[in-house]
Amino acid sequence: MSESKIVLNAVFGVKAGMTRIFDENGNHIPVTVIKIIPNLITQVKTDAKDGYNAYQVGFGEKREALLNKPNKGILAKAGVSQNVTHFAEIKSDAVDAANLGKEIDFEVFTPGAYVDVTGESKGKGFAGVMKRYNFQGGPAAHGSHFHRRPGSIGCRATPARVFRNKKMPGHLGVETSTVQNIQVVEVNLEAGYMLIKGSIPGSKNGFVKIMKSVKKA
């Protein structure tokens, strides 16, 4: 690892899509391809000043004309020349102001390690309760007029209202979702990609957060 890079317990990448690879026995393994992108330290949050220790990370890239003035100031102070599109924080037990402007190293994730991956689930538009919440639905045979409806949503004269967060039809997807305990199959820093076994949330070209597994060491 070079002096211009640091190691944290999480990184951000781009979901490129899915494919499959074959092991030495000829068994196919479904994998998700994650594009490795620069993760740059743009701010250092300290317990004394901010109440907690964390690094603000900038990733993604866009034209300079699309950057607003506050973000330009943050990047200039950090000495970051890349016009990043997204900012996020990664908490750390200890932080060092000398790491400002450095890049996070992907080498912390090795083949065989277990990770948790967070992304934004695909949007599926307006959906009914059977698709959205896996409701059973009504009878499908003849004579029934009740097939895919949610059924009664009320109660009685008391409380005479529908409770908050009642499961009803509505927008499905576009929610932060995390899959846990999935295995890193390959990390190729030269080619700029890593392979993770199985599927992860989100659509192609969406940003994902890869973290060391909480439940598995």
Q: What do the predicted segments below correspond to?
A:
Residues M1-A217:
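Extended basic (Lys/Arg/His-rich) segments that typically form rRNA-contacting surfaces
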